[in-house]
Amino acid sequence: MEKIIFATGNEHKMIEIRAILSDLGAEILSQKEAGIKADVVEDGATFEENAMIKATEIAKIANQMPEYKNAVVLADDSGLEIDYLNKEPGIYSARYMGEDTSYDIKNQTLLDRLEGVPDEKRTARFVCAIAAAMPDGSCEVVRGTMEGIIGHEIAGENGFGYDPIFFLPEYGCTSAELSPEKKNELSHRLSLIHI
């Protein structure tokens, strides 16, 4: 059975990835489940650079482990870009306001910063770059987006991160109000993994 290691410690992201990749028939492991204890510094200037850095660094470690020598390592870098805020928080989405700051606080801060801004200027997108480091040492990266606007309040229990403020006008709800199945169907990650 093919093994795919997804370079993340984010449990919510692993749930989403396992659902998206469930039809592959591969064993999907998180970095932790594979026993890889590495904290890769994502110091790239773009989502694509950060995804490639993470995938290649984790692949170097995995290739030293006999059970993962032929594993594919996937890594993503993703975040929220808000046009009115000059694409903030961007590549710093996870570290915005500090890594220990809860998303409830991050989301409320973004809503406060956009107070009084009309919907047509609240355009935003989730961006995801996924890199695949192959056993032969090659690495490919693709980028996808999911367009929306920043809503006016926190809404929804599904999803994680910025989902409760990311409003999808065509569905009349936030990403966090979508069912997990619908969210995965629309996901910026899903669109990339099937490329």
Labelled PLM ranges:
Residues 2-5, 11-192:
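Anionic-ligand binding patches
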